[in-house]
Swiss-Prot record:
Gene3D superfamilies: 4'-phosphopantetheinyl transferase domain. One of its GO terms (biological process) is fatty acid biosynthetic process. It comes from Klebsiella pneumoniae subsp. pneumoniae (strain ATCC 700721 / MGH 78578). Keywords: Cytoplasm, Fatty acid biosynthesis, Fatty acid metabolism, Lipid biosynthesis, Lipid metabolism, Magnesium, Metal-binding, Transferase. The keyword Repeat does not apply. Its cofactor is Mg(2+). GO terms for cellular component: cytoplasm. It is found in: Cytoplasm. Transfers the 4'-phosphopantetheine moiety from coenzyme A to a Ser of acyl-carrier-protein. SUPFAM superfamilies: 4'-phosphopantetheinyl transferase. This is Holo-[acyl-carrier-protein] synthase. InterPro entries: 4-PPantetheinyl_Trfase_dom, 4-PPantetheinyl_Trfase_dom_sf, ACPS, Ppantetheine-prot_Trfase_dom. Its main location: cytoplasm. The keyword Lipid metabolism applies.
Amino acid sequence: MAILGLGTDIVEIARIEAVIARSGDRLARRVLSDHEWSIWEQHQQPVRFLAKRFAVKEAAAKALGTGIRNGLAFNQFEVYNDELGKPKLRLWGEANLLAERMGVSAIHVTLADERHYACATVIVES
């Protein structure tokens, strides 16, 4: 296995909160998959949940070498947790096709949040 890409992103939680205050759930609708949306709607800390998902998806797009552009969209990345709570990532659509073309066989995700920030790192391996 070889590392094909590495991406990191940090999000100021207050900025996400300000966007939600200004435009309602528009950002969440753009960023979250249907499954993530159903969790977000009932989450005790929806702003923090959205900030962490945003950070993971930005980091994943960077790890794939493109960022969110060229046909990639936030909702093509889905963050979920395994049975132990470890964050994992599913890819859909163009993001999945790009990963297949790159020869990605494993995706590693780590995320953290503190009072003011959410941070994520994603490594893609062959």
